[in-house]
A protein has these predicted regions:
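Short, surface-exposed secondary-structure boundary micro-motifs
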Residues: 13, 19, 125-126, 163
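Single conserved hydrophobic/aromatic residue that forms the stacking wall/gate
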Residues: 1-9
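Loop/turn positions that initiate beta-strands
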Residues: 10-12, 118
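Acidic-aromatic/histidine active-site loop/patch
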Residues: 156
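The conserved catalytic core of RNA pseudouridine synthases
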Residues: 170-172
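Conserved, well-structured core segments that form or line functional sites
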Residues: 21-27, 38-114, 120-132
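Short, compositionally biased
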Residues: 27-43, 134-149
Length: 172
């Protein structure tokens, strides 16, 4: 019924994950937005996910490790009772969309590959309101949380520079 469709849409969120190629190089960015009106719980999830992204970006400096980024992201979301997906991670990016190193949204400070000036990476927290367990849908592409609770996803492409992280996909 129309009422059921409206109820489904009213508190829904949707992630838009886009990749573009320019002059042979890839850029990758994602944002999760409400579909129409959303409730306070979803609004908080969206806010915390974006803030966790920027906590991770602050760690994207030469000499730090991918573990520093992941630790910053996970440490940011945990006090809210949220979790991060472990099956999907950020990544290096350049001529190919997915390059080394992998950038998990969890980790131990000082562990994993060291970041070097000139690297370009994608940091992309995928934050769940509940558990991090996921189910891949029959189409082989769609993914939902096993507990049915909402998840949000934000991403930016970041250049590692001597002057700090440079966000290459910053939106106005």
């Amino acid at each position: 019924s129309r009422r059921q469709r409206q109820m489904c849409i009213r508190d829904s969120i949707i992630s838009l994950d886009l990749v573009v190629e320019l002059n042979g190089y890839m850029g990758d960015s994602c944002i999760t937005v409400p579909v129409g009106h959303t409730n306070k719980k979803n609004a908080q999830l969206l806010k915390v996910t974006e803030e966790a992204l920027f906590a991770g970006i602050k760690q994207a400096v030469p000499g730090n490790t991918v573990g520093d980024i992941g630790h910053a992201v996970e440490s940011y979301v945990r006090p809210y009772g949220y979790d991060v997906l472990r099956d999907y991670v950020g990544h290096g990016i350049g001529i190919e969309m997915h390059e080394d190193p992998e950038i998990p949204n969890y980790g131990m400070p000082g562990h994993g590959p060291r970041l070097e000036e000139g690297m370009v990476i994608c940091i992309e927290p995928m934050v769940t309101m509940g558990r991090a367990d996921i189910i891949t849908l029959r189409d082989g592409w769609g993914v939902v949380t096993a507990d049915g609770l909402p998840a949000a996803h934000c991403e930016h492409t970041i250049a590692i520079t001597g002057n700090g992280p440079r966000i290459l996909t910053l939106r106005d």
